[in-house]
Structures are given as C-alpha cells and as structure tokens.
C-alpha cells in the first residue's frame, strides 16, 4: 500500500511510518506530514506531551532517538555489528533499564518508545539470540508485548 499513488502523494519516498498531523498547517495550508520514526516521536512528544518541555529532557530524548535509530539499529540489523557491538550495547542498555524508570523524565515517552520498538524485534526476528544475560531487557520486552497498542499492531487483539 505504501507504494501506491495515494500514499506516495502523502510521502513520495513511500516509507513507513508517516504521520499526517492535521492540527498543524504548513505555510501552503497543507497539514504537517512527517516521516521517519524518530522525527515522528519527537514531534508527538514536543507537541502533545509534557515529558520533554525542558531543554535537558529534549536533548536526552533526542540522544535516545539517535541511539535507537542509528547505533542500536545498526548493531541489531548489520550482522558484523551484531557480533561485535551488540553484546556490549545490550549489557549497558540492560543496566540502564534495570531502574524500571523512564529513560527520560518521569513518564514513559518518546525515548522509551524508540528503544522498546527495537527491543521488541529481538524475539520476532532473532529468536536465536540468548537474552538470559539481559534480564532487564527481557522484562522490558515482556512489558512491551503486553501493551494494548503493541498487541493491536501485531494483530493479537
């Protein structure tokens, strides 16, 4: 569907996800259209949430979005990096998640969503990866899999 003319009129790159925010108008009167998950998450957090209103939280959220969409995704999806970088990154990420606190601020937000989206891929795409050394990551994945939005997106409800 994303390569059909109707979608390409919204996003000429034909990529998912894409967000059309009709509450914000561009100078030409068209609704704001954003693609790339990190940009969408940042827009939603800045526009519709109080979790990144400070410069510190905005900077930290941006850091986690960049980490998820570059460092973590490369370590996960590029085989040579998966062997070299993945264990080290997972060890530190497990330590970060062990606090059971949001990555930024006091409520679950864009940073958590970005990281947890990639972690949720692990059991689906890489069932051979042993997550036993990363108990906090395992727990995080289990919690993600129980979220109503995740269950709906995966067709479980």
Regions found by a protein language model. Give the residues of each.
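GST-like domain detector, emphasizing the conserved glutathione-binding G-site
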Residues: 1-94, 99
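Phosphate-coordinating loops and pocket residues in cytosolic domains that bind phosphorylated ligands
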Residues: 9, 146, 155
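GST-like fold's C-terminal all-alpha helical module
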Residues: 56, 64-151
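Exported/periplasmic ABC-transporter solute-binding proteins
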Residues: 140, 156-157
């Amino acid at each position: 569907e994303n390569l059909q003319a109707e979608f390409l009129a919204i996003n000429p790159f034909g990529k998912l996800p894409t967000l059309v925010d009709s509450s914000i108008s561009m100078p030409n009167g068209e609704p704001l259209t954003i693609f790339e998950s990190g940009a969408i998450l940042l827009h939603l957090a800045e526009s519709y949430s109080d979790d990144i209103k400070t410069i510190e939280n905005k900077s930290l959220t941006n850091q986690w979005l960049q980490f998820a969409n570059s460092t973590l995704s490369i370590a996960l999806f590029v085989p040579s990096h998966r062997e070299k970088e993945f264990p080290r990154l997972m060890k530190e990420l497990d330590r970060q998640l062990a606090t059971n606190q949001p990555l930024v601020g006091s409520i679950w937000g864009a940073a958590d969503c970005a990281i947890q989206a990639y972690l949720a891929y692990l059991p689906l795409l890489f069932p051979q990866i042993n997550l036993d050394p990363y108990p906090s990551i395992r727990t995080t994945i289990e919690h993600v899999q129980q979220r109503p939005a995740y269950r709906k997106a995966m067709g479980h409800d």
